């Protein structure tokens, strides 16, 4: 069973409101200004469509062919392939 400190060590603040949870799976929350060498995403969650929460450039850099992207309808409209 995973201990709490180990779980917390997998959560990374990326600046502003962006976070990455290392897995597997690798999960991003509101990726914005993510470093170019960041791990690819298995799941991307977007809270809303504002530019600093819904960055098509960052999403496209992080996504893989099987990455699941979930966001509000307004956010999904900005990201091709989002649900």
Which residues are covered by each model-predicted region?
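Conserved beta-strand hairpin/beta-sheet module of binuclear metal-dependent hydrolase folds
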Residues: 1-39, 43
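Active-site metal-binding motif and surrounding structural segment of the metallo-beta-lactamase
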Residues: 32-77
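Metallo-beta-lactamase
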Residues: 2-8, 14, 70-83
